[in-house]
Every structure is written in structure tokens, then in C-alpha cells.
């Protein structure tokens, strides 16, 4: 069951106009009156999408019967706390000429402390049977601005994930309760943090700083420019769906419903949100020495499917939002709309996050977007895995990968057997096992990768007209188990083909500065000592 909380329900009266004149008279072409509130609208969308939902919140003495009638008509389950006062009314002015929405929102009637405490108890009573909780929207006078933080702390005792859709103090305080996902729009995000953003990179970096505080996902909706979803390892971007916009107000609530639906479908399948093959491996200290301790006996999960789940989250959210945009007023998406738009939703990588290191490999404690690391020349970690064997006549040979022709940099060049960056939170060893599996399909067992040495390099170049300063501290490994090239599974985005090359021949090739090889002579000289 997906719980939604609406502490400030309302009557939304939407006026559709053309060329709205502030301070003047503007004819109204259509009016639409709906009872709603952010959490209630999320429940309405979830009901349309076929997901189980229970609506929780306040019900006012005046207007409360209409609120219940609306939920009954939609066959939405609810458990509401009755309070004195009148259901507030909000005025929405949708201008068809420029697709903008102006809002006049009433703050609502004051709520007593006793009613707040009863409401908290009522909400918490449903936690034991819930799979997900949505806290959304404003709160009326009398409700403390840390109410969402309070509910988040209580949800933690039930291991109940929470989506928080709020702004201002409600969002800032709520972040301290570590929700599973937050969803401010760009204006709310900017106002809440007290910062102006001049690029997508700045938005992503600010969101990643919030992720570092223990929040798995931050979604920043960009209105007509699409949406960003930022997690621990990477950031994703989805452009706004190409639809005829008839209403804006229900899109944000439908977006949240899309996140809920993606979560619900994974929950039904019994899938972990980052479920992948695990390997055990030996930890290395920064000098490269084996550090055999209890930590080295733990399993390190390769979170290869976490990005896949992130993409599902964003695709579902954008498809649900698209379905709402085609409807007037505050109407939310229908299942038929969701199914129609889901195949059209595009999601692309907007960035990866690296731990910033010192030249000696020690962490600075800062996490930055990959593009900013390369812009600022920050030291970061990489792993180089050389696959080696010997021919029947005893000659040593190394496996070379030919980089994909679709790569942005050095397409078609010959490169290390397998290599990759350390994502934020990675250690060298787990990154090495992961990259070897992702790029070549080699599932190494504990101890199969032999650490050899660290190598540092600093290169300044220009890429797409931008100065790039690449400062890497790479851990170099050897993999010497038998390898059947016909059974490798190459990562298409990274590798076109692989082939063996004699070590002596490779050394000769690297004497030629024009050779299309991304391999350093110094590294090969170092590897020779271990072969």
C-alpha cells in the first residue's frame, strides 16, 4: 500500500484565459473546480495507474464532506482526521497563449496542537502495512514546519521509504529526516537553498551535495526543460515530453505518482533496488598492500543495475507527467496516457560523480561531478586491468581492447584490456572487479585480480573546445586466468573488439608517437616486472 499525506487539502478553481493582463480585465474561456491537494492528487493518479493507495490527511468541518465524496467517487481509500474550519480555496490562472500558470493559494485554517498530534498518530498507525509513504504539499497554520521531519523519523523505525515533495522550511527540515527521494521544481530548489543556478552542472552538483547527506535520490523538475534525477553514482536527464500542454498544475503530482509506480512494480517483483552479482575481494590500502581483515571478507555488491532502476524511475515519472500535461486544470494522468507516452520517454546520462583525492590517493572528502573534476584538474581514482597469458612457446602476451567508434574521445584507439573510473564511494578493488565484468564479461573470483602498483598521470588537453585537466591515480592489476575470446561479452558502448598482442611487439609499437594506442610505456615497463 502506498500512503499519501495531505495536510492542507483545498478546492482548486482553475481559470483558463488567453493573454492574461495583470491589473486589467481578461475574459475567462473555461473554468474547472476540483478538490485536491498534492498528496490527494498523487493518490488519484496512483488509483488511475492501478497501484494501491491510501489517502491520509485533514478533513475540515466545512467542505470535508465534499472531500470525502470526491475520494469515494474515485474509489480511493482514505483515513482522515476531522478538524474545525473551512476547506481552503486556491485560484489557478492558466494562460493558453504562453502556457504559464499563475497561482493564488490560500494558507488554510489554523490547526490545533492536539489535532496535529492526533494526525501524526493516525498516519503512523498505517506504517506497518505500507510499502511507501508520500509527504507532499504545504501545511496550514498551527502545523510545525518540522512535521515532515517528525514523520520521516517515525517512518525510519518501520524501514518505510518516503518521497518528500515540499519546499522552503518543510523541505529543509525534511531533508534532515533522510527521505528516499525529494522532488522540488527548479524554483523551489533555488529558493530553498538560497542559490541561483546558471547551468545544469551547478544544479546537479548542488543536488549531489544533498544526496551526500543520506538521501538516495533527488529529482529536480525543470518545467519545459525536462527533469533531472541525481543519485549517489550518477545523474540522469530526461527532456520534457513533446505533448500539447493543456494544464500544468497536475504534472508535478503525476510525476511523483510515476516514481511511486516504478517503486511499486519493483516491490511486487521482490527485487532489491540495487541487486546484482556480488564478489568477495581483498581490500588494498593506499600503498597497494593487501589489507586482510574482517572487512575484506565482506561481500561487495556490484551495483550494475542501480542505474537501470534509476532510468525506470525517471521514465515512469516523466510518462505520468506527460499524461497530466495533456489535461486541463489540475487533472492527473490516466493509465492509457501513461502507457502511450512511456515508450517515447528519453533518458540520458547527465553526469557521473567521483571522489576527489589528493595526489597520494587519500580522499579529500569532496564529491564532484566528473565534468567539474576534469575542469578543475582534481585528482581522482581509476583502475587498469591487464589480462595476460603465455603462448605455447612461452612468450607473454596482453589482451588489447579496441575502443568503440562511438566513444567521444579516442574512438577506435587501442587501449588497456579493461579500465574505468572509481565512482563516488568505490574502493579500487571493487571498481576493478566491476569494470572487468562490465566491459569484458569476465566474472573474476576473489583473488583472481593481482594488484601490482599505483601509477599517476596528469594530462592537459582540449576536448570539444573545453580545456580538460585529467589527473588520475590508477591502480594497476593483472588477470592471468585462461580467457576464451569467443566467450567474452563486450560492452558495446565501450569496446568494439579485443585481440592478443605479444608484449615485445606492444613495446615496439609504443615507441611510435603516432600509434593509435592509449597505453603508456611506463605502465608496460611496470607490468613486465610482474609477468
Feature roles, as predicted:
Residues 1-56, 64-66:
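Glycine-rich phosphate/adenosyl-contacting loop at the front of the ribokinase-like
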Residues 382-418:
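A glycine-rich, hydrophobic loop/mini-helix early in the fold
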Residues 349-393:
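Acidic, metal-coordinating catalytic segment for phosphate/diphosphate chemistry
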Residues 146-234:
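Conserved phosphate/ATP/ADP-binding segment of small-molecule kinases
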Residues 400, 417-452:
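The catalytic Nudix box helix
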Residues 172, 200-348:
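Conserved phosphate-binding/catalytic region of the ribokinase-like
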Amino acid at each position: 500500500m502506498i500512503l499519501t499525506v495531505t495536510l492542507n487539502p483545498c478546492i482548486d478553481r482553475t481559470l483558463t484565459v488567453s493573454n492574461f493582463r495583470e491589473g486589467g480585465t481578461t475574459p475567462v474561456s473555461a473554468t474547472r473546480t476540483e478538490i485536491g491537494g498534492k498528496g490527494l492528487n498523487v493518490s488519484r493518479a496512483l488509483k488511475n495507474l492501478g497501484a494501491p493507495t491510501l489517502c491520509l490527511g485533514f478533513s475540515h468541518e466545512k467542505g470535508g464532506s465534499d472531500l470525502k465524496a470526491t475520494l469515494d467517487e474515485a474509489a480511493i481509500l482514505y483515513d482522515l482526521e476531522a478538524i474545525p474550519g473551512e476547506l481552503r480555496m486556491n485560484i489557478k490562472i492558466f494562460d493558453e497563449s504562453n502556457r504559464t500558470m499563475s497561482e493564488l493559494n490560500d494558507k488554510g485554517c489554523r490547526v490545533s496542537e492536539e489535532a496535529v498530534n492526533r494526525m501524526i498518530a493516525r498516519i503512523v498507525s498505517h506504517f506497518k502495512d505500507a510499502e511507501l509513504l508520500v509527504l507532499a504539499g504545504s501545511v496550514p497554520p498551527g502545523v510545525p514546519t518540522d512535521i515532515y521531519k517528525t514523520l520521516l523519523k517515525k517512518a525510519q523505525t518501520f524501514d518505510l521509504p518516503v518521497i518528500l515533495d515540499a519546499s522552503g522550511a518543510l523541505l529543509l527540515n525534511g531533508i534532515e529526516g533522510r527521505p528516499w527521494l525529494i522532488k522540488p521544481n527548479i524554483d523551489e530548489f533555488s529558493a530553498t537553498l538560497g542559490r541561483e543556478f546558471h547551468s545544469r552542472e551547478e544544479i546537479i552538483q548542488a543536488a549531489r551535495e544533498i544526496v551526500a547527506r543520506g538521501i538516495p535520490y533527488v529529482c529536480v523538475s525543470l518545467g519545459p526543460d525536462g527533469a533531472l534525477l541525481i543519485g549517489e553514482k550518477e545523474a540522469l536527464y530526461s527532456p520534457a515530453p513533446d505533448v500539447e500542454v493543456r494544464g500544468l498544475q497536475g504534472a508535478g503530482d503525476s510525476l511523483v505518482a510515476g516514481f511511486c509506480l516504478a517503486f511499486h512494480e519493483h516491490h511486487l517483483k521482490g527485487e532489491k533496488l540495487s541487486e546484482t552479482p556480488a564478489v568477495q575481494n581483498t581490500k588494498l590500502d593506499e600503498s597497494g598492500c593487501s589489507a586482510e581483515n574482517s572487512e575484506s571478507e565482506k561481500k561487495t555488491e556490484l551495483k550494475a543495475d542501480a542505474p537501470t532502476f534509476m532510468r525506470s524511475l525517471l521514465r515512469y515519472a516523466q510518462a505520468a507527467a506527460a499524461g497530466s500535461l495533456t489535461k486541463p486544470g489540475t487533472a492527473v494522468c490516466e493509465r492509457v496516457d501513461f502507457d502511450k507516452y512511456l515508450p517515447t520517454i528519453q533518458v540520458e546520462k547527465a553526469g557521473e560523480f567521483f571522489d576527489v583525492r589528493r595526489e597520494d590517493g587519500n580522499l579529500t572528502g569532496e564529491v564532484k561531478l566528473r565534468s567539474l573534476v576534469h575542469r578543475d584538474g582534481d585528482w581522482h581514482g581509476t583502475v587498469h586491468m591487464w589480462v595476460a597469458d603465455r603462448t605455447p612457446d612461452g612468450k607473454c602476451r596482453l589482451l588489447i581492447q579496441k575502443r568503440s567508434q562511438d566513444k567521444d574521445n579516442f574512438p577506435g584507439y587501442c587501449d588497456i584490456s579493461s579500465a574505468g573510473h572509481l565512482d563516488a564511494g568505490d574502493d579500487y578493488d571493487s571498481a576493478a572487479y566491476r569494470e572487468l565484468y562490465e566491459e569484458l564479461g569476465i566474472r573474476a573470483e576473489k583473488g583472481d585480480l593481482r594488484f601490482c602498483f599505483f601509477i599517476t598521470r596528469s594530462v592537459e588537453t582540449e576536448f570539444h573546445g573545453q580545456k580538460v585537466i585529467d589527473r588520475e591515480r590508477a591502480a594497476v592489476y593483472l588477470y592471468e586466468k585462461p580467457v576464451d575470446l569467443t566467450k567474452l561479452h563486450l560492452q558495446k558502448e565501450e569496446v568494439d573488439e579485443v585481440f592478443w598482442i605479444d608484449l615485445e611487439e606492444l613495446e615496439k609499437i609504443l615507441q611510435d608517437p603516432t600509434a593509435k594506442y592509449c597505453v603508456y610505456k611506463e605502465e608496460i615497463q611496470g607490468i613486465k616486472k610482474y609477468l
